[in-house]
Amino acid sequence: MTGRHFRDYHLLDEQAEQIFDMTDDIAERARKLGGATLRSIRDIVQHQRLKDNNGDQADAHRMLLELRADNLQLTGYLRAAHSLCDRHNDVATASLTENWIDQTERRTWFLSETING
């Protein structure tokens, strides 16, 4: 992103770090439960649910709208995962998921304020 709001938008780096940390926690939890983790870019592509945007560079406003929509969708996926954890009495993963839901809702709020501000 470029322009007069570059510094404000640079705060999105914090969101990227949160998401990266979340993926690390997910992989660690999967391994603790005896599961497999993603092994390659192809593996990621085959399992991803949020669509990539491979178009030409979008304007900043459109990018923020897309990020907000992605976070809203991720919140729904996390809530579904939490329900699954509850059904299987997996308290530890449910607890992690609660934190991730909170972080995702916070990112959505931040993006909404930036978009509407």
Mark where each language-model region is:
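Conserved alpha-helical segments that form or flank metal/cofactor-binding pockets of metalloenzymes
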Residues: M1, F6-D43
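Short, flexible helix-adjacent loops and helix caps
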Residues: M1-H5, S83, R87-D90, N116
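Residue-identity detector for glycine
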Residues: G3, G34-G35, G55, G76, ...
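Long, contiguous binding/interaction regions
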Residues: H5, E17, A36-Q48, L65-Q73, ...
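Acidic/histidine-rich alpha-helical segments that form the ligand environment
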Residues: D24, E28, V45-N99
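Amphipathic alpha-helical coiled-coil segments
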Residues: D25-A27, R107-I115
